[in-house]
Amino acid sequence: MWKIQTALEKDIQAIARDLGGRLAPDRRPVLEDKVARYIRKPDRTLFIALDESRVIGFSTIIEDPEIRGDLTRETVGSLQGLAMITGLLVEVNYRRQGIGQALVRAMEKWAFNRGGKGVWLVTREQAAWYRRHFGYREMERIVSDGVQKTILAKTRISASK
């Protein structure tokens, strides 16, 4: 049975080992460095999904990110004070078991417990999943580097509906 927990310094190598298996060997240190930065900075966190001691998924969130990109002024204003989900991954063999949902709920709880107004994210293909399972609402669609992306958000108010 799997479980969700906050990643700690001692988890860095296991995360890189278990989730970096498909990366070229020279890319694993890059992953390890990125994971370490998420764990060490106080304004962000990394959650991991574990099956026994094997890391099978992760999610990352930043409390008060710098909002960049080609967003309208209205969208930027709406996203102020919201934490940003910056990553979500579940190993292929573990998908459709509720792990992704548990990781998203852990991030939302983290943001709300820190006094945040809500959370937002950018997605290419999973917008319907976030709307259906968590009540996220579409803020804006953009094209970045030729790829269509959807900006979604969920606030305390929309969470209670």
Where do the PLM segments sit?
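Conserved acyl-donor/pantetheine-binding loop and adjacent beta-alpha core of acyl/acetyltransferases
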Residues: D26, L50, R54-G87, R95, ...
